[in-house]
Amino acid sequence: GLRIGALTTHRSIEKSPLIYEKYKVLSEMEKSVASVQTRNWGTIGGNLCSADPIGDPAPSLIALNAKLKIVSSRGERTIPLEKFFKDYFTTVLKPDEILTEIQLPPPVAHTGVVYMKFSTIEAGIKIVSTSVLITIDPGKMTCKNARIVMSAVAPVPFNAKKGGKLLIGNKIDDQLIE
């Protein structure tokens, strides 16, 4: 797997050879985060903790099944990123807690992940974004796992679980996608 510190800048993630090799979707997604200037100083942890429903990283990280390490003076806990957001600009963080780390499981063989952002201008505020993860069963050439996660469509990132379930067990082709 991979652990990304909460203070890691967007630009560091975008330019990391290790992340590009193992989690290419994150490098590609980071290119769409605001401007280069913002990516140079903005952090992944700050982005997630702001809980902005139009945030770029959350859909891809949720599709990848990311977990968050949260620390306080009482100890630490790890939660799925999907359970981190409560409402517009609201998280499950308690007043004495901080996010310290994003944890990603090891990449799964025969899996592809893509991130797409639709906005009115390049590097502009998006209308909607989505990240799709699909794992293929190479023996049957059918979908074994699918996750479709969107932002800017609800107060928190939306995991379209029913959409993912529709793909499982089916051969992925143009007809199914339509």
Question: Predicted regions span which residues?
Answer:
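C-terminal structural segment of proteins
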Residues: 1-178
